[in-house]
């Protein structure tokens, strides 16, 4: 579970799921585009929509107050990045590789090495 402090209030964020993704899209936000283009403001707003279970206008208001109150956009985007790391669904949708393929590749390499040693 990820914790994020937005506008001086701390929220516990459950694992991001399909419904969270569709909530972002229902607010007119393509999180895949925003993420791939590095649009941090849009990403922060989309994540705020999910965390607060609110619409885009309310998220804009809250993020604005967060920044005016001395908070940083990175408070929100860093928490989003951590939440994405914990969500298999969001990692897949955003095209983020997991560690498993690397392990599989390493295992394949070890097996190839053993085969080469056997051939010699």
Language-model regions: role of each:
Residues 14-16:
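Short linear motifs in exposed loops
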Residues 2-10, 19-21, 26-35, 56-120:
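Charged interaction scaffolds used for protein-protein
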Residues 42-53, 78-82:
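Short, hydrophobic/amphipathic alpha-helical patches that form generic packing surfaces
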């Amino acid at each position: 579970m990820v914790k994020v402090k937005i506008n001086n209030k701390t929220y516990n964020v459950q694992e991001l799921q399909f419904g969270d993704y569709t909530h972002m899209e229902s607010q007119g936000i393509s999180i895949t585009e925003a993420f791939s283009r590095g649009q941090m403001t849009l990403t922060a707003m989309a994540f705020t929509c999910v965390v607060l279970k609110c619409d885009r206008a309310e998220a804009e208001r809250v993020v604005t107050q967060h920044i005016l109150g001395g908070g940083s956009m990175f408070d929100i985007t860093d928490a989003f990045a951590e939440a994405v790391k914990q969500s298999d669904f969001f990692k897949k949708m955003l095209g983020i590789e997991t560690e498993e393929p690397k392990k599989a590749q390493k295992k394949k390499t070890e097996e190839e090495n053993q085969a080469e040693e056997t051939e010699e």
